[in-house]
Regions:
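Charge-rich, well-structured scaffold segments of protease-associated domains
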Residues: 1-89, 112, 121, 126, ...
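Flexible, small-/acidic-enriched active-site or ligand-binding loops
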Residues: 101-104
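Long, positively charged, glycine-interspersed low-complexity recognition regions
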Residues: 115-117
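A short catalytic or substrate-binding loop motif that flags glycine-/basic-rich loops and adjacent residues
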Residues: 108-109
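Self-splicing inteins and homing endonuclease
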Residues: 97-98
Length: 267
């Protein structure tokens, strides 16, 4: 299972990017671990991990739909077994803001060269992390919108295709803004993006595009409340992140172009 991803170019380039950005943070390690680390697992270690992390006091139950709270609680009390109250604390190694290396190149027999450009940003938590995530998402959407000079210029010159996209990858003590896709000349794409980011940091983002993107994101978020599964996911993700379920709606409605420009300059 660990080795089967070694010939997946998307998987390889993703972790190559993380390993180029992070010195110590475990996010750079393949989620399945390594062959060496798996070999060290014993039955005792496995049971210890199970009883420590798969613990009711370390879990959140999220229920959405046509149900009654009292009935759900009664059923949970009947089926769930009492366990030791264990308070867990995740301790991450100190991570410098400097990157490990500016470029990683891996050769593989694929039809088109793939690239990921990752910006290592300052991590945050709670509401601050939510605000940063929303601002970063909007800023990248404005910069790379299909009508933006950056996107149109790269598309016209054949530097990108329909696979070009952006992503915010963040979690406990890490935050990365990513731009990715396929290109015959990834270095030219990198220089175009660098120039566009520098110009936006100096002169500001397109305000009309920002407002349109913000309103579009707001509308999409509101529509999710019609989906029962999406509501359940929202509640559990909010609980795990230390925020309230409606904080995203409130935060998104209050963001301004000045907030986005400030994030772009500082991050």
């Amino acid at each position: 299972e660990i080795q089967m991803c070694n010939d997946d170019p998307g998987w390889r380039i993703f972790f190559n990017t993380l390993q180029g950005l992070f010195h110590h943070h475990p996010v750079k390690i393949d989620i399945a671990g390594t062959i060496e680390s798996i070999a060290q697992i014993t039955p005792e270690l496995l049971y210890r991990c199970y009883h420590t992390f798969y613990n009711l006091h370390n879990m959140v139950l999220s229920v959405a739909g046509n149900c009654k709270v009292d009935e759900v609680v009664a059923l949970a009390d009947k089926l769930l077994k009492p366990c030791e109250d264990m308070q867990l604390e995740c301790i991450f190694p100190e991570e410098p803001m400097e990157i490990v290396r500016a470029e990683t190149v891996e050769t593989a027999p694929i039809g088109t060269t793939m690239f990921v450009l990752g910006y290592k940003c300052k991590p945050a938590s709670g509401l601050e992390n939510l605000k940063k995530e929303l601002l970063a998402t909007l800023a990248l959407k404005v910069l790379t919108h299909v009508t933006s000079p950056l996107y149109q210029g790269m598309l016209k010159d054949g530097l990108i295709n329909e696979t070009f996209s952006t992503e915010i990858f963040n979690g406990d003590d890490f935050f990365v803004a990513m731009l990715e896709g396929e290109s015959k000349d990834p270095h030219a794409v990198r220089e175009r993006i660098f120039a566009a980011v520098e110009d936006a940091a100096k002169n500001g983002l397109d305000e009309t595009l920002f407002e349109n993107s913000r309103k579009n994101a707001y509308g999409s978020l509101i529509m999710k409340f019609n989906n029962v599964e999406a509501v359940a996911n929202l509640m559990i993700n909010s609980a795990m992140s230390g925020i309230a379920p409606f904080d995203t709606v409130t935060m998104l409605s209050s963001l301004t172009i000045e907030d986005a420009n400030r994030w772009l300059r500082e991050e």
